[in-house]
Amino acid sequence: MAARQAVGSGAQETCGLDRILEALKLLLSPGGSGSSSLQVTKHDVLLATLKSNLSALEDKFLKDPQWKNLKLLRDEIADKAEWPQNSVDVTWSFTSQTLLLLLCLKETMIRLAANFNPGKPNPRTPEVAPALSPDALSISQQKTVQFVLQFVVTLGICPYLMPGVGVPLRYRTEFGAVVQDVVCFDAAPDATRRLYTSCKALLNVAQHTSLGSLIFCHHFGDIAAGLCQLGFCPTKRKLLTPAEEVLTEEERTLSRGALRDMLDQVYQPLAVRELLILQGGPPQSCTDVKTQMRCRAPAWLRRLCGQLLSERLMRPNGVQAVVRGILEGAGAGAAGGSDAEVTAADWKKCDLIAKILASCPQQSLSPENYYRDICPQVLDLFHFQDKLTARQFQRVATTTFITLSRERPHLAAKYLLQPVLAPLHRCLNTAELSESDMVPGTILVTEEELSRCIEDVFKVYVVGNEPLTVLMDSLLPVLGVLFLLYCFTKQSVSHIRSLCQEILLWILGKLERKKAIASLKGFAGLDKAVPSLHSLCQFRVATQGGIMITIKEAISDEDEDEALYQKVSSEQGRVEHLGDLLSHCQECGLAGDFFIFCLKELTHVASENETELKTEPFSSKSLLELEQHQTLLVEGQERKLLVLQLMAVLCERMSEQIFTNVTQVVDFVAATLQRACASLAHQAESTVESQTLSMSMGLVAVMLGGAVQLKSSDFAVLKQLLPLLEKVSNTYPDPVIQELAVDLRITISTHGAFATEAVSMAAQSTLNRKDLEGKIEEQQQTSHERPTDVAHSHLEQQQSHETAPQTGLQSNAPIIPQGVNEPSTTTSQKSGSVTTEQLQEVLLSAYDPQIPTRAAALRTLSHWIEQREAKALEMQEKLLKIFLENLEHEDTFVYLSAIQGVALLSDVYPEKILPDLLAQYDSSKDKHTPETRMKVGEVLMRIVRALGDMVSKYREPLIHTFLRGVRDPDGAHRASSLANLGELCQRLDFLLGSVVHEVTACLIAVAKTDGEVQVRRAAIHVVVLLLRGLSQKATEVLSAVLKDLYHLLKHVVCLEPDDVAKLHAQLALEELDDIMKNFLFPPQKLEKKIMVLP
């Protein structure tokens, strides 16, 4: 025996990998053609082939001396093996010999690796790869091993699995069905012993790293199924089989341990996926009859897989393993593939995972412990950077967040919401800062923490879009900090600005209206009880472009003025940013409700002023009381100023659609009536107040006159105005308003059945005012700005608390001279109807410092030019001078009006005005500012469009000016010149022929060499306009340069770094493709000429 062991040891030293792999190939096929010949055999032919392969291998061992060492190694391993190797069943004999050769391969690879001693690398040739370990398998050798493993699993494991355990062999391949029929289950050894032997031998082979990766990557599921059956399948106690054919309890225990060791060893998502397959998963619809006939997994296996999956889940990083295990099979993560985008859209699968994660397994000691371990891993799913998996992981995390918040709100608040919102809670004015944190300059919240916090809140609240109570209540305390952060991001560029805005808009839209109004009061500073940023904390721009929260530096005496200025400007900016935020909340009605709240606050301000006048004399107060009184007075004045500032901003930012329902309009009118009554009580009635009151009552008249379809519920709301209207009718000094108030009371009380003439006249007067201003409102919209409306004007004029906002039912005329207003409201004037006095008044208004007056005057002059008014056209030089001077104005409404005027004037006298404009556009920066040149460029573009076919007359000066502008050092001017060049070329058609080469050379040079992105975009856009404008004529007009343009577009698509320029180039290529298709394959006209013979 000792001699045999010595020989065996020598065999291990001399036996090589090539010999073992050659033996394995011999077992696969006698012709060496791999497994292809076996896959086409049937039953008897397969058995004969297996016998032939076994005989050929034994002949090699007996007759070929070169195989002697391998034979000795195989015999040594066979002696150590504890399983029966010979059987009447050929399939088992084949499997047994294959397993022995795999064990020989493993032992040889271990021996070769142990004896390998690589030399030291040569420092002179560091680029040379290190020596390869002798136990490494080549690609072809790995394929051979994979074929062998497939046969071992197919013949040694799959046939012996119980129904419902694993995927049946006959449903995998046609060859698998053949194998299932040729296995002899009656021959020794028993099927259970065969399964145990195969699994144990394969796990032994898998101890080598290289071989283990080949086994587990492809056959983990089958081995796991076998170990589950061996270790956990209930045994029948009634009929005991012979001892050699029954697994002992020790072997079952070893099988259970091997299963758990294998699950811990492999890639965890792979383990999760295979366990789900073993468990059976949800029933799937399938038209395949074979698939429908598959047995369901037995109950013990389903329970076992559920237990093992729960163990995988509760391990470190178990959540990620479960998510990857379920999703990767469909294209996410490491698996990737063409189905990744399909999987990203499959939200149902992500939601199913979320339900699994939110359900506490039975193995957990308590839900508290489970969620304490799971929730941090769920939060980590939000922070994956891989674009392919990020969407799915975030969907799973968001849905888990929502599900847990719905089912276990107290645990969600403790383990999910508190960690997410912790950076914001840390800097609240209600939080207690430690002494170490109060050192000036200390970073309380880092840039990464704050960015991650805002992104997580956005994903949970806005993306999840579930207004659960626990979610709303958790976010309410930090809304003040969130709003201040939003205000800070508005001061500079920040990637979290849009996230903060979306979060605030979402929460304000989902909150109850009272809570939303309370939050807005806190944002504006009207409610000090709302939690906000700690007085010692401040936002600062971080080094990576984000935002961090730090402790303020101590303010010295010299910096007190600067600190006060910063405080005042920040408060003013906060109110303006609140107005911007509310401008997005008009459709839901929140902006209207907050506006009405501010109106009511104005009434309180008036009443507070009255009480202040009746205060006790200072002589009756102590010094402490006097100081407290002065503090309260200062706070009260600050609140009043804040309310006035809020009203001014809201009037400026809100559109006429601020009120979305009848209730809001009635509340607005009620607030106006209350304020009027309060003013009467204080004897402070004014003309502006009378106009405001008249307009608000006109609103009610419009609604009662049929502008709004009123229901019985609306009349119930309108009845709230009856006491106020009665008070106005009894106390207001103006008899017209008194009469209107009485008539409105009658109409409301009778539900509109009786309406006096005064009500109808008031409604018509209000609607006429709206029509009067309709044209100017359109001009305001085109300038993309909202100039201060009449409510703001009233507020500034009286400086006392009056306002009348625009609503969806009325709007007020701007304050401009009558001479300006009259011509603009007449659209059908005849030539000569404008008098000299009117013209002079409008010309004077064109120099008025008030922006609305000046803009209206410019629009009026433009209208007269468009109508060819003789008086206006006689002063063309004067008008041109006025328009050109106003081009340099900074207000959008003014200079856009001036641009329109110059364009209309040039349309009338192009030969006189166009040369001056071209000279001004072509001038240097010293003569005109870049902004003015850009505005002149806009004028030239409008002139080119207006001239149409007549533009050919001025082709030479226009095209030369634009080509020179492309060489200007200012990038914005170059882009403007290219835009104008595109408009011009689009309209020249065949007249472009003589300069087509110059234009093409210019575009190619700019698109390839210009350093500014906007200029390159403009050049490519010119090509798009050129092809789009010429359409089918492009093959004739651009015949000489079409190839150059095609090469340019391909160059941009392939090499241009800017995505917008690439998009323009792609659009141009599509235009060119359509042009050429229509040129080469013109559409067939299915028509036939019918000639009538004389």
Curated annotation (Swiss-Prot):
HEAT repeats lie at residues 873-909, 952-988. InterPro entries: ARM-like, ARM-type_fold, Rtp1_C1, Rtp1_C2, TANGO6/Rtp1. It is a single-pass membrane protein. It is found in: Membrane. The modification Phosphoserine is found at S556. One of its GO terms (cellular component) is membrane. It comes from the Eukaryota. Residues 796-813, 821-834 have a biased composition (Polar residues). Keywords: Membrane, Phosphoprotein, Repeat, Transmembrane, Transmembrane helix. GO terms for biological process: protein secretion. Residues 777-834 are annotated as: Disordered. The chain crosses the membrane at residues 468-488. Residues 777-795 have a biased composition (Basic and acidic residues). Belongs to the Tango6 family. This is Transport and Golgi organization protein 6 homolog. It comes from Homo sapiens (Human).
